[in-house]
Amino acid sequence: MASFSILSIFKIGVGPSSSHTIGPMEAGARFCESLKGILEQVVRVQITLHGSLALTGKGHLSDEAVLIGLHGIYANELEVTTKKALLHEALENKVLKLANQHHIPFDYAKDLIFDNKPLTRHQNALILKAFNSKNEVLKEETYYSVGGGFVYTEKELDNLSEEDGNESIAYDFSSAKELLELCQKHQKSIAEIVRLRENALKNHPDATMVKIYHAMLECYDNGANSKERYLPGSLKVTRLAPSIKTRLEKHPTSGKDPLALIDYISLYARAIAEENASGGKVVTAPTNGACAVVPSVLLYAKNHLFENLSQKAINDFLLTSAAIGYLYKKNASLSGAEAGCQAEIGVASSMAAGGLAHLCQATTQQVLIASEIAMEHHLGLTCDPVGGLVQIPCIERNVLGAIKAISASKLALEDEYKPKVSLDEVIATMYATGKDMNEKYKETSLGGLAKTLKC
């Protein structure tokens, strides 16, 4: 496997879920690639969604995602018109154009299985099988969607464990402590260390962050200016961002209310989270369910804190945030199905707090303190999406995650602030808490608000 890029914490894809939509779509597309040489022999495919993918798969559009992937399409390539046409062909006409080349019959009721029982390696798993005319299995693969749009086969998961101990990457780090030491040794900021690391891997950190930033802006614009009244699904949740935007344009907040800027943060976060919930184009940050926290804090900084924020400063914010997200991916989880919403909104808030602290001229130590504070006050947060949809409580959690990130950043900048808990310690605590959490509260829609609220 190629060396892990910190830049991949941010991925351009589609909503509503990175683990349940982007991941299954990638699994389907990769399975198509594995059929090269035997594609014409395939007469049927079977999809089995396991664990959380089965329990919340319909609300998260996992079923539709894997079907689109089996056409050889990845989430960053998908257009809305293409999506509608492919799903109509597969679900209404019962024909699947495998790898966008080979037509086979498809029966949703028989060929797509929802198995609530999780596999042992991760709560989000899917098994894909291809059969020939004799009903023999030509190819079978198990994929694990581990959060943030990252997908691995069984073999790749094994290789990940081996690489952790064997791989040597310039300017790499495995903990916040190591990151701090790197910054001090080279007299560089976190963003600069990430640049050095990614350049050593022949990646293009600044060009990539420009692309990510513009995708975030596009997502905000689409959500804030949507003409749709309701989000899709049975809950009939009203899109609130367009009306907030209209109100703020007509009646900008005055200086009388010291907390008036919260309305703008709500606008930014709701617009992006609502666009994600509608299945629109989004950026994982680090997941789709938490996609609005980082960009809404960035928009707050750009539009209200700093005049003429440069593209380099924006890139620095994103690279700093990505470094924090990388620590959670490496040492804990980005999956609500594995560790609850603390692994999604909590991580996003931690990332955004670190990024904002950097923009506010924080030291590296203060950046890490800000990230720690933000996570500390998300510990134990459950993932209980009502109806399996990424709407209630997910959208408003993005708003509050952004507000907490801003508060954490401000706290960390206090000269007399002396932390008792390190970022490494809170990351370990989050993961342990997630492992201890009852499965009902880990993206199964079997507990919490998902059970209390009847839809």
Curated annotation (Swiss-Prot):
Cofactor note: Binds 1 [4Fe-4S] cluster.
Species classification: Bacteria, Pseudomonadati, Campylobacterota, Epsilonproteobacteria, Campylobacterales
GO BP terms in the entry: gluconeogenesis
NCBIfam families in the record: sda_mono
Record keywords, A-Z: 4Fe-4S, Gluconeogenesis, Iron, Iron-sulfur, Lyase, Metal-binding
Cofactor: [4Fe-4S] cluster
Entry similarity comment: Belongs to the iron-sulfur dependent L-serine dehydratase family.
Pathway(s) served: Carbohydrate biosynthesis; gluconeogenesis
Entry's Gene Ontology molecular function annotations: 4 iron, 4 sulfur cluster binding; L-serine ammonia-lyase activity; metal ion binding
SUPFAM superfamilies found in the cross-reference section: Serine metabolism enzymes domain (SSF143548)
Protein name: L-serine dehydratase
Residues annotated as signal peptide: none
Top EC class of this enzyme: lyase
Organism: Helicobacter pylori (strain ATCC 700392 / 26695)
EC number: 4.3.1.17
